[in-house]
């Protein structure tokens, strides 16, 4: 359950380290985001001399949440942190590597490039 003002870790090598959610995209009444949702974020912490600077407004896709996700077979999955991957306007990742596991729900939402770069898919 990612909402406005939530801080997210960055799970790629784009240069950002921490993000703060400005808006969850997907409709006027969409309050919460979960795995696979696109959010608009502000970069709160970044690596020096990277393409992404502190204060930049970026789009990101949520790849891990601490709040459990119920799957259609009745199982639940949750992660140790809230994390996102920075994407461009074509929904392609801005970084070239993904760190940590990502949820299988990303494949169903069409983020195949992120799934293929991830070391583990849960």
Swiss-Prot record:
One of its GO terms (cellular component) is cytosolic large ribosomal subunit. Transmembrane segments: none annotated. One of its GO terms (biological process) is translation. InterPro entries: Ribosomal_uL14 (IPR000218), Ribosomal_uL14_bac-type (IPR005745), Ribosomal_uL14_CS (IPR019972), Ribosomal_uL14_sf (IPR036853). It comes from the Bacteria. The keyword Electron transport does not apply. One of its GO terms (molecular function) is structural constituent of ribosome. The keyword RNA-binding applies. Keywords: Ribonucleoprotein, Ribosomal protein, RNA-binding, rRNA-binding. Gene3D superfamilies: Ribosomal protein L14. Belongs to the universal ribosomal protein uL14 family. Binds to 23S rRNA. Forms part of two intersubunit bridges in the 70S ribosome. Part of the 50S ribosomal subunit. Forms a cluster with proteins L3 and L19. In the 70S ribosome, L14 and L19 interact and together make contacts with the 16S rRNA in bridges B5 and B8. PANTHER family: 50S/60S RIBOSOMAL PROTEIN L14/L23 (PTHR11761), LARGE RIBOSOMAL SUBUNIT PROTEIN UL14M (PTHR11761:SF3). This is Large ribosomal subunit protein uL14. It comes from Thermotoga neapolitana (strain ATCC 49049 / DSM 4359 / NBRC 107923 / NS-E).
